[in-house]
Amino acid sequence: MKKRSPKRSPKKTRKASKPASSLTSRHLALKRTVVRPSATKGELKYLHWGEVELETLNPLLQRQLIVGLNVMLTRVLLKKGCIVPLHSHVNEQLSYILEGALKFWIDGREIVVHAGEVLTIPPNMPHKAEALEDTIDLDIFNPPRADWINKTDSYLRK
């Protein structure tokens, strides 16, 4: 006599989860507000760029700042042809290009940084940049840039 195997329920198939979508300008949509987020000891912040003040420095340059205790994240919007004049600062800088491209003059070299690429700039290293096309740049500074926070960065406001 043949042994019967127990009835098994059909295998349940899991739905494949959707891959995380890439960051697009839709995610970075701007809304004008008056919030200037800054951290104080032990404060947790959860923000959308649309909640962060958009500051216009000149007709070709705008930025948003999120300031932490030891680091600052900035979203910089540059129109094609915008020049960031030669300058240096005591802050270490990481520049991540979300959209567009920036040409940097730094350490005796010209470096073009495209969307998806990162440039690290050590403290006190003079540098200049030009937007080769409309560009969205995320800059991280350690420590936070006091001249940007208190708006004494006249080299950008021309």
Where do the model's predicted regions map?
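Ligand-binding loop in jelly-roll beta-barrel domains
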Residues: 123-147
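A short, N-terminal "cap"/entry segment at the start of jelly-roll beta-barrel domains
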Residues: 1-70, 153-158
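Structural motif
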Residues: 94, 101-103, 110, 126, ...
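Conserved short histidine dyad/triad with adjacent acidic residue
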Residues: 57-59, 74-88
